[in-house]
Amino acid sequence: MEKNRERKYQKSEKKHFCSKVILLLLIIPFFRPDFISEMSDSSWINIIFVIWRMTAFFFILGKYGIDFLKNPELDRNFIVIVIYEIILLYSSIYNQEMIKERLIDIANFLGIYFIYISYGKQQPKLFIKVNFQFFSFLVWTNAVLTVIFPHGLNRAVDNSARVNFLGKDNTITLIFILTIVFCALYHNIFPRNPAPFLTTVVICTLQFYYMSGSGIVVTVVLILYLCFVSDWNWINRLLNGNLMFMIYMILEVMIVFLNHIEFLNPLFFWLNKASTFTDRRYYWDTAIYQFLDSPFWGQGNGITYLWNNNYYSHNSFLDILLKGGIAGTVLWCVMVLYLINRVKLKKNLRVKGFIVCCFFCFLLTGLMEGLEDRIAFNAFLSVLPVLNRMEETEMLRNKLINSGSQIKKHAKPVIKYSK
């Protein structure tokens, strides 16, 4: 009897270890550290990651298809994403622009969606644990290398050109926000573990060191929420995706389309970023002018042609307007709002409020950078549909990173899950 029990335990442990390794091997190629492409675009390492990502995509596509055949269930999230991607692909074909790049972006989005939706529903504890450990490893590695190479791995003279382990200062924020999301989810499973808090502290420290304008604003917003208002239920009820998206659009219109930034001058002065916003105006004005040439379908790519060179528009909304025009932009807004509104979490108001706060932080970063083709943002969107399932299985305890180790008395007992 004891031998049979021990064999079952060993078999369970082996199965758990194999699942963990497979999930890790699927995730890694989608989050390749950006320094690889920034510093050695044609290196053999980059080629390995491309092949690895393709293999991971076809593997998870097959798994998703097999799971669907076993349990045919209409995946509305997948349908919304596919409709949006079809419109952008049509825009690229219509304009004969960057068709290959569009197909790669589609594969990246669908690949990470299949991974997150499959493991997030079937093995939620393993899913949270592996993602937290993986992103924490990236963050801590980035921190150590920043201490060793304070001017970046490329030893840049200008901070804006500094290349860190996870990428440049102005794009690394997206990975940091996604990591903090998994810190909060991990804390719900292991409330006494200090690792989520320590990782969050490292992220905040790095953000203030890098002095990226959007990164500092996002960090301040998250600190204010976690430290001061996360316990207020009326705030968490007030926080919803539609309201945050509306505020984001107001900022887009005021800052980008009307170029009225005077009311934010004190903030820009404090961040020492007034010149940065002045430079952004050239990108924004050029992007708006190009968008008006083909307003409905866009130009098929997000490039602005300025000073005889190709530049990024440095704004998420203008980026999608250029790529897909009005048609693509409307569907992008519908997709984003549909996915964020899928999060109910009636028994976990604090977790829901925090997720919406992180959603707003992504949008704030989108004022200065693109979001549509960023794997970190698409991964965040892919997490949203599985949160309700986690609540149904009582995986969530309505706890955040700043919570103590004590579980409140009125909280329901949590069922212990196997690894």
Language-model segments: what does each one mean?
Residues 21-28, 343-369, 383-388:
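Loop-to-helix entry and N-terminal half of a specific, functionally important transmembrane alpha helix
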Residues 126-153, 166-229:
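Alpha-helical transmembrane segments of multi-pass inner-membrane proteins
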Residues 2-64, 84-92, 142-151, 362:
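N-terminal signal-anchor transmembrane segment
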Residues 42, 234-241, 251-285, 305-308:
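Flexible juxtamembrane loops connecting transmembrane helices in multi-pass membrane enzymes
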Residues 49, 76-87, 96-120, 134:
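Aromatic-anchored transmembrane helix interface
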Residues 180-181, 354-363, 372-419:
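Transmembrane alpha-helices of multi-pass inner-membrane enzymes
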Residues 14, 64-78, 185-197, 234-243, ...:
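Membrane-interface helix-loop-helix junctions at transmembrane boundaries of multi-pass membrane enzymes
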Residues 35, 268-327:
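Long extracytoplasmic/lumenal interhelical loops at the membrane interface
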